[in-house]
Swiss-Prot record:
Organism: Schizosaccharomyces pombe (strain 972 / ATCC 24843)
Record protein name field: ADP-ribosylation factor guanine nucleotide-exchange factor sec72
One Gene Ontology cellular component annotation held by this UniProt entry: COPI-coated vesicle membrane
Gene: sec72
PTM annotation (Phosphothreonine): residues: T597, T654
Residue ranges of the region described as Disordered: 1-54, 66-126, 1111-1131, 1584-1610
Gene disruption: observed consequences: Sensitizes cells to tamoxifen (TAM).
Molecular function per GO: guanyl-nucleotide exchange factor activity
Compositional bias ranges of the Polar residues kind: 72-84
Function (record text): Guanine exchange factor that acts as an activator of arf1 at the trans-Golgi net-work and is thus involved in vesicular budding and traffic between compartments of the Golgi apparatus. Activation of Arf (ADP-ribosylation factor) GTPases is essential for vesicle formation via recruitment of cargo adapters and coat proteins necessary for Golgi trafficking. Involved in the resistance to tamoxifen (TAM), an anticancer drug used to treat estrogen receptor (ER)-positive breast cancer.
Any one GO BP annotation for this protein: endoplasmic reticulum to Golgi vesicle-mediated transport
Phosphoserine carried by residues: S44, S122, S125, S653, S669, S1110, S1606, S1609
UniProt-annotated location(s): Cytoplasm; Golgi apparatus; Golgi apparatus, trans-Golgi network; Cytoplasmic vesicle, COPI-coated vesicle membrane
Length: 1822
């Protein structure tokens, strides 16, 4: 029994609102029977009449307790299965059982009534009797007669005269089957109910129920005017039944009969007898009240079942009517005239609005819906049905949102809570079974103007949101659970129509439920259960991502936040001890859909107080459920991706197929699948009522949106950190124009995520730009008709007011201006508003700051604000109102208030967490605080929904498009966005948990993530998860391996088997684990741990990795120190671990990984080989100090090479690029065992590979055999190289016919072997090569191996280890050339290209000789090679053309002397000094002589190359080696003298130019530059006297006190520069000598043109002038001495005198060879060049003082003697012409002291001849 003080819940025609929206249609649900409750109650009455059974006994037995009625459904099964028995314990189960009993009980009931009661279809086909009555009418008469007879027997009835007379009147009419007025029956029942006798009322109600089942009362029959306001008999009877009992405690049988009668009316299927509108609602309300106030649990259960059935029937009728009319009716045009008032105006944002207050006090255009009876559409069945459906749903929603006081919340059995629960359950049932009707766009209201054009979902939209927002955070578990189910339906079936609302509920309700610390376990658990059901639907998950995470307008990344929130549950919270019976927990945690409504009667087990909180569950159970959610998400994503890939690979477009599959059928119950497509096509477009439209998802578009959204978040975060930088970044990414303050202000005003403190500081800044933005920002606010305090509150909700007074001042100034502009009559001027605003802010701080003890009083506040209104006072009442308002309601940020309100849910309590104290007695403060926090969460959600619906209503938001998921490409970005929380959720249990099921879930999750990452090439994610798994194997510490570690290992092996094609670099981690596993297996069978080092530990030690660094993930698991490893040796491997790791499953898994490599893709097998090579190398290096290193991975490498040998060449080439490099490494490893194993394996592979036929012009064999060449070229031991030669020899012997491109590599092996210093290797190489030359020469020539063979023999020749082999090899080269020469001569008959012939056959031999000449170590070999080379040039070169000689000269002859070219720098010469000296003294001399012979013999063909050969000789002459210079001089002289007669003018021009260029290049011009010697640090400085003394010695030696000048202080650069200048001075002297000697040769002088001699003479003159200038610069020479240029005073006296002597000698010789009296231009030029210079030299010599210039005097004496002698020998005419030029110079010589006798004699002769000439001249004149 209920508390009589509790109010009875009445259900008036509650007002409603609607938000128009469209959706697609679901599949139709099967219809449910509609007469079961009435029938069971009828049966109860019959049995009671006959046997005296209590009313409702059957219902009681079937609805409560453990008593279950066994009902025979058919002859095959006479009892219910346990599942069916369980189902019968719910109202839905009762309905099903009642339907099954209907058929059985019809016969029994009809026998009792004596007249059969046919169903509606039977009644429609009955034939009328002769009396004019149908069988149905006769049955009703029988029922009425029986009723009258029962009433007659009751005294109370007979005492009522009117009633008595009426019964006496009716009985004969009924018996005679005459027609009569049905109102008489109504009047009779009215009398019965007026009697207030339970017995009479029960008989009446029983009869009415039977008449109602016969559709006896019709809505067409009207009551007479005398009866009151006109209404139908049907309405009259329903009202009469409803009014028969009141809300006080009444007899239970009477309540049951009322339920039976109302159920009969509601379930009646006759059109005219159906209940609609208010009549229907009145009936439902009475059933609802009976459920609440029922006399017993049985009655309440029956009422609940009847209520459920009534609601079901309403929607079944709607479905049936719509199905019938849908085929003929067209989609009507929608009416956009609907307006909503559910959301309050934005002008009152500070008013606390809840959905409860809206429901109770709000008015809307839908709250007073009027039905136009004259509209024909109203009378249609479909329109009546949709109106009934809407009204019933609206009523349930209004009941569900009624506010419940806290004390009632704690009492789950109170009427208020039971009313809320049944309403919520009915709402859920309606949405679950009829979601397709709600979204069907063809099912629309037509008869109600306010609803015209709306669908059910549009009309019901706001009510669904209302229900959830008010109840979703309820602390009552039962309420919270059913709200979760409703929200799930919203997401599952209605998500396209509730896009924004779903985001709100996720953000404001369900995410906080998981994130907040002190929400109850019940709330967290049921939240997780619903999330799990969502996670099972791949389409729903993808659509959450693309519609929220990729939507720029969405403030919440729902999918991403979903993963972050559920992952927190796994990582937060204390760890609790797990009980041993943990296996029994999981079934209770399984996700189960609500398949039936639980009993909600007063004493129902579902309302027991102990289930208010799930105190038996702990954090562990929540973590298990969270883990299951993560696993379901991953499974859904994987299924969606794989299905999409499958379709795409088949060439099927996912857009065309819809890409639906079976994913929407995620539920395991019969929940209808809501497809967002209607009849396979998109159902509708966005319209004026819809807040969302449906579109298909384009992956590229969403990727762009996601990136832009992420970038915007980054910019906003940057702004929150540094506003100026943030705005710059926003501008750079085109989110806002940084030069437009208005655009900036609008962005800051509307953008989500802006930190309000930062925003306030920025707006308060004093720079011009910030002020402009602040002004525009405040202008975005509207203060029209707002009170001043409310306006200030609105302003301060936008940002946090900065603390600096100047910033506040600027903001308040603008606020005051804005307020007064929009409210000009509020104050006298803006100054008043400014002062008052500032005063209010100070008041708010004073009143609410805890640090201020003495608070401001109201009088103080009024006093402070006197005279501010333009000198006048503001009204004191107004100021007092302001004071009171601030005192009661602080001006504070809503965010702060909301945070403070939910603080009880965020902070840890000292007692039990959450709402577990609800079961305790008294009003606990903690419980109250938590209830208030929940209320605040509800209010916040309501406020957000209010704002959202306001925007939708007023069009302030763009049409919100909802995108259907059709592409699998979204899965990759989804995983990229959420892999970190997934990793955290899955990794945490692997660290500590030993629970097998939990570990299996984690490992399944890892496997799914890797699968998805592999499908979409997400390398970072794949590597992160695989590395994490490898870290959990614990193979580095064998003694600590546990069951969970073995499970991880098996998971890694499964991943390797299933995802091999996409693992890429992750193969390294997996193969490392396999290597470690093999090591552990060896340890398990008794091998010493020290004999099998761990590759991870070795790698860490080798690389010295810092474990704390972020890039050492790979090495974390192996980061054990040496001491740790030592300790582990003392702990043996556990037998359990050995058993697991050596199990057949593990062994077969490893084998399968390697054997399946043949099926890997081309790129995957390359990655596999690369990883295995790296692991093998780690094994080898880690055990390099052992005698027997680890070769496990190397063996596997060879093994899989055989498996993959048959791959196509393109793939094998890629494999060998990796494998070949690895064999290079291991084949040359310093450990002999490794190298031998590798080479032997390579030999076997090569033998196998050579069996594969290779076509010409391919190089697979060449590349495959490269490792042999690499090993031979390495520094490995001789034994390994011997093995290489043996392997090569074996391959040649066995497969010589198969070898093609491999010859090049094999000869490469021989070439490197020929370079070795080992006699054995050289001997083996020579023997093999000789055998090839003698036995297989033709084969080699066919394979174009000539060059390779010559190179090998050349290397043998160059190697000086064995002279005999070198000489024999040189002889073989000669034989090769002889063979080639014969072949060339024989082949010339076919006239092949001469150039091609020489290039292919001759040049390789020439190059071999050249290489030997240049590089051979043995001098005899060099000499013979040179002889052979020049023998070919001299004797075998008849067929050489000029082009051939040009090539030969440039490639073979000139390079021999390249060491003397400019490219041979000084450093190279110094390093090779000993070698060069040997070369110079031996080969070079012979080469130069041979070269001169060649030039002489083949001059005709080499004539055009003369310049090159002259350059060669000039380089040889100009070396600083005297021997070379002499050889060069001799060769040059021999060449010119021997071929002078062949030289043409152009050739002599080359010779002259060569000498001129040499003189220029060797002139040390830097000697004359003082800045060259500016760095004289540390050099000695002479005194002035010493300098004077030295200055008088022009070329003399050092003074007597000689100084030893050290050059250690001179920089190396200066020293090199000094040496270069000295070398040039020496070369000048050498050039002068060369020219002199060359032109002394009469053969040369006679053939060289005089013009070219003059050119050389000019160069010699320049040399003389340079030396002269240097010698005369005394200060420069002293400076050179001071800086350490030389150890004595430098001079160029020899160059000066030698060049002067050569100069005059050549000119006098030219005069002799020409006509003495010639007047040609050349003659005149010679005269000008000669005689003035001679006079100059004579004058200079005459000026020399013998005592001071003794050396100079002696040096110049030969020059003067030559001049005088040459003058004397001039012809008379020429002598006479130049007397005036030379006479006075000779006169000056006479006065010279100590004149040499020779010169004295020459002067004497000169003057004698002059005298003779002059005397003869005078005599002639006389």
């Amino acid at each position: 029994m209920q508390d009589a003080s509790e109010p009875v819940i009445n259900m008036p025609a509650l007002p409603m609102n609607s938000v128009n929206e469209q959706h697609d249609r679901h599949e139709d649900l099967p219809e449910v029977g509609t007469t079961s409750v009435t029938k069971i109650i009828n049966d109860s009455d019959n049995e009671d009449d006959e046997n005296g059974m209590d009313l409702g006994r059957v219902a009681s037995e079937s609805l409560e307790g453990d008593a279950v009625v066994s009902i025979d459904i058919n002859t095959e099964d006479s009892s219910l299965s346990p599942a069916k028995q369980e189902n019968e314990k719910s109202p839905e189960g009762i309905e099903q059982k009642y339907q099954e009993e209907d058929l059985k009980d019809d016969k029994k009931s009809n026998e009792t009534i004596a007249t059969p009661v046919p169903d509606a279809a039977s009644r429609a086909s009955l034939e009328k009797q002769k009396s004019g009555l149908t069988n149905l009418e006769k049955s009703t008469h029988v029922v009425l007669i029986k009723c009258i007879e029962q009433l007659i027997q009751i005294k109370v009835c007979m005492k009522n005269e009117k009633m008595k007379n009426l019964m006496e009147q009716l009985k004969p009419l009924l018996q005679t089957e005459c027609q009569f007025d049905k109102f008489l029956i109504v009047e009779l029942f009215q009398y019965c109910f007026e009697s207030s006798q339970d017995e009479v009322m029960n008989i009446s109600l029983d009869t009415i129920s039977k008449l109602a089942s016969f559709a006896y009362f019709s809505s067409k029959d009207k009551t007479p005017a005398s009866f009151g306001p006109p209404k139908s008999l049907l309405q009259c009877m329903v009202d009469m039944v409803c009014d028969s009992i009141n809300d006080e405690v009444v007899d239970g049988n009477l309540q049951l009969n009322v339920v039976k009668a109302l159920s009969a009316f509601i379930l009646c299927s006759e059109q005219d007898s159906m209940l609609h509108g208010a009549i229907l609602l009145n009936s439902v309300r009475k059933l609802f009240n009976v459920f609440l106030l029922g006399d017993s649990d049985t009655i309440q259960s029956v009422a609940q079942a009847s209520l459920t059935q009534a609601v079901t029937v309403v929607y079944e009728r709607l479905r049936a009517s719509h199905t019938q009319s849908n085929s003929t009716s067209a989609l009507p045009e929608e009416d956009a005239s609907v307006t909503e008032n559910w959301v309050h105006d934005e002008d009152e944002p500070d008013k606390k609005i809840t959905l409860h207050s809206m429901a109770s006090a709000g008015t809307s255009s839908l709250d007073h819906v009027k039905v136009d009876a004259d509209d024909p559409a109203v009378t249609s069945v479909e329109n009546s049905s949709i109106q009934d459906a809407f009204l019933v749903f609206r009523s349930m929603c209004r009941l569900a949102v009624r506010q419940t006081s806290p004390d009632k919340v704690s009492n789950i059995r109170s009427q208020a809570m039971r009313a809320k629960l049944i309403s919520l359950h009915l709402i859920y049932r309606i949405l679950e079974k009829n979601s397709d009707l709600f979204m069907d766009p063809t099912l629309q209201f037509r008869g109600i103007p306010a609803l015209k054009g709306m669908t059910l979902v549009h009309a019901s939209r706001q009510y669904i949101c209302l229900v959830l927002s008010r109840n979703a955070v309820s602390p009552v578990p039962q309420v919270f659970e059913v709200c979760c189910d409703i929200f799930y339906l919203m997401v599952f079936s209605l998500r396209a129509h509730f896009k924004q609302e779903i985001e709100v509920f996720f953000r404001e309700v369900y995410f906080p439920m998981l994130d907040l610390k002190n929400t109850s376990y019940n709330q967290k658990l049921h939240t997780l259960l619903i999330i799990q059901r969502i996670c099972l639907n791949p389409r729903a998950l993808v659509e959450l991502y693309i519609n929220y995470d990729c939507d720029r307008s969405s403030t919440t990344n729902v999918f991403e936040q979903l993963l972050f929130s559920i992952s927190k549950v796994t990582t937060n919270g204390p760890s609790e001890t797990i009980s041993e019976d943990i296996e029994e927990i999981l079934p209770s945690l399984e996700s189960s859909e609500r398949s039936s409504t639980p009993f909600l009667n007063t004493n129902s087990a579902s309302l027991k107080s102990e289930v208010v909180q799930l105190t038996t569950f702990s954090d562990f159970q929540l973590k298990l459920k969270t883990l299951q959610c993560v696993l379901d998400i991953l499974q859904s994503l994987s299924n969606w991706a794989e299905s999409g890939l499958y379709l795409s690979r088949r060439g099927v477009s996912t857009d065309e197929q819809g890409f639906v599959g079976d994913y929407d059928a995620l539920s395991r119950s019969d929940t209808p699948v809501t497809n967002p497509y209607y009849n396979g096509k998109q159902s509708f477009e966005a319209n004026s009522h819809s807040s969302s439209s449906i579109a298909l998802a384009d992956p590229s578009q969403f990727e762009s949106n996601k990136q832009r959204k992420k970038l915007l978040r980054t910019c906003i975060n940057k702004f929150n950190y540094k506003p100026t930088r943030g705005l710059k970044m926003l501008s750079e990414n085109e989110y806002v124009d940084i030069n437009d303050p208005k655009a900036i202000a609008e962005f800051l005003f509307r953008a989500d995520g802006i930190d309000k403190t930062t925003l306030g500081d920025y707006l308060g800044e004093g720079d011009e730009k910030s002020i402009s933005v602040m002004h525009e920002f405040i202008d975005c606010l509207s203060f029209i008709n707002l009170k001043f305090v409310d306006a200030l509150r609105r302003l301060l909700q936008c940002f946090r007011l900065p603390g600096e007074a100047q910033k506040i001042d600027r903001i308040m100034l603008k606020f005051s201006e804005r307020y007064m502009k929009e409210n000009p009559s509020a104050f006298a001027n803006a100054d008043t508003a400014y002062i008052l605003a500032y005063s209010i802010i100070l008041l708010n701080t004073d009143l609410h700051s805890p640090r201020i003890k003495n608070k401001m009083t109201k009088e103080d506040f009024i006093k402070n604000n006197r005279g501010i209104n333009d000198g006048a006072d503001l009204d004191e009442d107004y100021l007092g109102f302001v004071y009171d308002d601030i005192l009661k309601n602080e001006i504070a940020m809503k965010d702060d208030q909301e945070l403070a309100a939910i603080a009880p849910l965020m902070n840890n309590f000292s007692t039990s967490s959450g709402f577990t104290t609800f079961t305790s007695n008294g009003r606990d403060l903690q419980r109250v605080a938590c209830i208030q926090a929940s209320e605040e969460m509800a209010n916040k959600a309501t406020s957000v929904l209010k704002k959202l619906l306001y925007q939708q209503k007023h069009g302030s938001q763009k049409t919100n498009v909802y995108y259907n998921a059709t592409h699998f490409e979204h899965i990759g970005p989804m995983l990229e966005a959420t892999w970190m929380p997934i990793l955290a959720a899955l990794s945490n249990p692997l660290q500590n948990s030993d629970y097998v099921n939990e570990l299996n879930m984690c490992l399944d999750g890892f496997q799914l993530v890797v699968r998805i990452a592999c499908l979409f090439d997400l390398d970072l994610i794949r590597d992160a998860f695989i590395k994490t798994l490898t870290n959990f194997t614990n193979l580095h510490s064998t003694s600590e391996i546990k069951l969970r570690n073995t499970m991880v290992i098996k998971t890694l092996l499964r991943i390797a088997s299933t995802e091999g094609n996409n693992l890429k670099d992750s193969w390294k981690d997996i193969l490392t684990i396999i290597s470690q596993l093999e090591r552990v297996q060896l340890i398990g069978v008794g091998v010493d741990e020290t004999e099998v080092p761990d590759v991870i530990n070795a790698r860490v030690r080798r690389k010295n990795v810092n474990i704390g660094s972020s890039n050492s993930i790979r090495h974390v698991s192996g980061s054990t120190s040496r001491s740790t490893r030592t300790r582990s040796l003392s702990k043996p491997l556990s037998p359990e671990a050995v058993s697991e790791l050596m199990s057949t499953e593990v062994v077969l898994s490893i084998d399968r990984i390697f054997t399946q490599t043949s099926s890997l893709s081309g790129s995957a097998i390359v990655s596999f080989f690369k990883a295995l090579c790296e692991v093998s190398w780690d094994e080898i290096t880690s055990s390099s100090d052992l005698e027997q290193p680890r070769l496990y991975s190397l063996q596997k490498l060879v093994e899989i090479s055989y498996y993959n040998m048959q791959r196509i060449r393109v793939e094998w080439s890629s494999i060998w690029n990796v494998l070949g490099r690895f064999f290079n490494m291991v084949g040359s490893d310093e450990n002999r065992h490794v190298a031998v194993f590798a080479l032997d394996s390579l030999r076997q592979l090569s033998m196998h590979f050579l069996e594969i036929e290779e076509l010409s012009l391919f190089s697979f064999q060449k590349e495959f055999l490269k490792p042999f060449e690499y090993v031979m070229a390495s520094d490995t031991v001789v034994e390994v190289k011997e093995l290489v030669l043996q392997c090569v020899k074996q391959m040649i012997q066995a497969k010589i016919s198969k070898i093609k491109s491999g010859w090049k590599t094999l000869f490469g092996v021989f070439t490197f072997a020929a370079k070795a210093r080992s006699e054995i290797l050289i001997s083996m190489t020579f023997d093999t090569l000789v055998n090839l030359f003698s036995e297989h020469y033709d084969t080699l020539m066919q394979q174009n191996c000539l060059i390779d063979m010559l190179i090998s023999f050349t290397e043998l020749c160059k190697n000086g280890t064995n002279q005999k082999i070198s000489l024999q090899s040189l002889e073989i080269i000669r034989e090769v050339y002889s063979s080639l020469s014969t072949m060339i001569k024989e082949g010339l008959s076919s006239k092949p290209s001469v150039n091609e012939t020489f290039s292919k056959y001759v040049f390789p031999v020439l190059f071999a000789y050249y290489d030997i000449i240049m590089s051979a170590e043995d001098l005899e070999v060099r000499s013979r090679a040179l002889q052979n080379l020049f023998y070919i040039f001299l004797e075998e070169s008849d067929d050489f053309t000029e082009e051939t000689w040009e090539v030969v000269s440039r490639k073979f002859i000139f390079p021999i002397f390249s060491i003397f070219g400019p490219e041979a720098d000084e450093a190279t010469v110094m390093l090779r000094d000993e070698e060069i000296r040997t070369w110079q003294s031996t080969t070079l001399v012979e080469a130069l002589r041979s070269l001169v012979t060649l030039l002489t013999r083949r001059f005709d063909k080499l004539h055009n190359l003369l310049k090159g050969y002259l350059w060669l000789f000039s380089n040889c002459i100009c070396r600083d080696n005297i021997t070379l210079s002499r050889i060069g001089t001799n060769c040059m002289q021999q060449l010119l003298s021997g071929n002078a007669y062949r030289f043409e003018v152009k050739d002599w021009n080359l010779v002259a130019d060569m000498f001129i260029e040499l003189f220029k290049e060797t002139t040390p011009h830097q000697l004359l530059l003082l800045e060259t010697f500016s760095n004289g640090q540390g050099a000695p400085v002479y005194s002035e006297n010493e300098n004077t003394q030295l200055s008088h010695k022009r070329g003399g030696s050092l003074p007597e006190t000689s100084r030893s000048i050290s050059t250690s202080s001179i920089s190396p650069e200066k020293q090199m520069e000094f040496r270069s200048m000295i070398r040039k001075c020496i070369l000048q002297l050498l050039l002068i000598s060369i020219v002199a000697e060359l032109l002394d040769n009469e053969e040369v002088f006679n053939h060289i043109p005089h013009e070219h001699v003059l050119k050389i003479t000019v160069a010699i003159y320049d040399s003389w002038q340079f030396a002269r200038k240097f010698n005369e610069d005394k200060s420069l020479r002293i400076t050179l001495l001071n800086v350490g240029f030389m150890k004595q005073l430098p001079n160029l006296l020899r160059q000066e005198t030698a060049s002067a002597l050569l100069y005059i000698t050549l000119l006098f010789r030219l005069l002799k060879t020409r006509d003495p009296l010639g007047k040609t231009e050349t003659d005149q030029k010679i005269h000008k060049l000669l005689f003035p210079v001679c006079a100059e030299m004579l004058d200079m010599y005459a000026s020399l003082v013998v005592e001071k210039h003794t050396r100079n005097h002696a040096a110049w004496q030969p020059v003067i003697a030559t001049i005088l002698d040459s003058i004397l020998n001039l012809p008379l005419e020429l002598f006479s012409e130049n007397i005036h030029t030379l006479y006075f110079s000779c006169c000056s010589m006479i006065a010279k002291e100590n004149l040499d006798d020779q010169l004295r004699e020459l002067l004497k002769n000169y003057f004698n001849r002059v005298g003779h000439i002059l005397l003869n001249l005078n005599a002639q004149q006389e």
